[in-house]
Design a protein with these regions (language model features):
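Short boundary/linker motifs that mark transitions into or out of structured domains
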Residues: 13-27, 107
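Positively charged, aromatic-enriched patches within helix-turn-helix-type DNA-binding elements
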Residues: 25-92, 97
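Minor-groove-contacting beta-hairpin "wing" of winged helix-turn-helix DNA-binding domains
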Residues: 99-104
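Basic, amphipathic DNA-recognition helix from helix-turn-helix-like DNA-binding domains
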Residues: 1-15
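Intrinsically disordered, low-complexity protein-interaction/activation regions
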Residues: 4-7, 86-88, 105-107
Length: 107
């Protein structure tokens, strides 16, 4: 398939509300502001943007972003969600007690 076709471009850009992630350029924008994200933060927000409104367990996020190297009892997911919350202006990531987190897909 031609990389310049609309379908190919749609797959390369994820957007929820005013947050846009360009997979080709590896850039995340919130409105007209570029977010300065680490590799792990980028992987985490990509996971949220691929599953808006869906509750993602800590284990699933840990496995996707960090692989199998980390202790499931680690709070690394919570720490990085905290980093993302500080960088995203607004209440985008909701805590679902006892399960994990979800990206709010509407205001």
């Amino acid at each position: 398939r031609d990389a310049s076709s609309p379908k190919a471009n749609e797959e390369m850009v994820l957007q929820v509300r005013d947050v846009t992630l360009d997979l080709r350029k590896r850039v995340v924008m919130q409105g007209d502001r570029t977010l300065d994200l680490s590799v792990r933060e980028f992987a985490l927000i990509e996971m949220f943007l691929r599953h808006p409104g869906q509750v993602l367990s800590r284990d699933r996020l840990l496995e996707h972003v960090w692989g199998y190297d980390y202790d499931p009892g680690s709070n690394i997911v919570d720490v990085y969600v905290g980093y993302l919350r500080k960088k995203l202006k607004g209440d985008y990531i909701e805590t679902v007690r006892g399960i994990g987190y979800k990206l709010r897909s509407n205001r």
